[in-house]
């Protein structure tokens, strides 16, 4: 069966009674009906104070202190801290994966001005992702194995969420001297 569609516009007649059904806009209402909480005393002594000491924040030094991942501003993770981070991603149900980079572990462009594959954003995967891993010491043992195979490489641990198919966590597990 075929159906027939029409492009003709349908015009309805409007009566004066219909026009009066909606009240005209009379402007915004006064704000006096709403409660207002204003602080009448603007004395500077009532503001938060640090006891008279003024400490300015320092700027991250851009030379010889490269930032790599989320926790790169912190000192190198101890073995205990590393195990806690690995345990966190395992508790979340993420799949641990190790990657390493021999050479500069930051984004650089020496062959071209535009971004590409060989500009330091992509690291080499160490073995396969550790699907089914439930123990943080297994991941730490793989970090040691990668560190022994490539002592001059940076090693990072990534946590993948295989349900959402995204990388959820990434941190440096080993930095060469």
Curated annotation (Swiss-Prot):
Signal sequence region: none
GO biological process entries: photorespiration; reductive pentose-phosphate cycle
Keywords: Calvin cycle, Carbon dioxide fixation, Chloroplast, Photorespiration, Photosynthesis, Plastid, Transit peptide
A single Gene Ontology CC term: chloroplast
Principal location listed in the UniProt entry: plastid
One annotated GO molecular function: ribulose-bisphosphate carboxylase activity
CDD domains, A to Z: RuBisCO_small (cd03527)
Localisation: Plastid, Chloroplast
Pfam families to which the protein is assigned, alphabetical: RbcS, RuBisCO_small
InterPro entries (alphabetical): RuBisCO_ssu, RuBisCO_ssu_dom, RuBisCO_ssu_N, RuBisCO_ssu_sf
Keyword Transit peptide in annotation: yes
Keyword Magnesium belongs to the record: no
Highest taxon, organism lineage: Eukaryota
Transit pept. (range): 1-55
Family: Belongs to the RuBisCO small chain family.
PANTHER family referenced in this protein's UniProt entry, alphabetically: RIBULOSE BISPHOSPHATE CARBOXYLASE SMALL CHAIN 1, CHLOROPLASTIC, RIBULOSE BISPHOSPHATE CARBOXYLASE SMALL SUBUNIT 1A, CHLOROPLASTIC-RELATED
Function of the molecule: RuBisCO catalyzes two reactions: the carboxylation of D-ribulose 1,5-bisphosphate, the primary event in carbon dioxide fixation, as well as the oxidative fragmentation of the pentose substrate. Both reactions occur simultaneously and in competition at the same active site. Although the small subunit is not catalytic it is essential for maximal activity.
Assembly information from the UniProt record: Heterohexadecamer of 8 large and 8 small subunits.
Comment field (misc): The basic functional RuBisCO is composed of a large chain homodimer in a 'head-to-tail' conformation. In form I RuBisCO this homodimer is arranged in a barrel-like tetramer with the small subunits forming a tetrameric 'cap' on each end of the 'barrel'.
Protein name: Ribulose bisphosphate carboxylase small subunit, chloroplastic
Annotated source species: Silene latifolia subsp. alba
Lineage: Eukaryota, Viridiplantae, Streptophyta, Embryophyta, Tracheophyta
Gene: RBCS
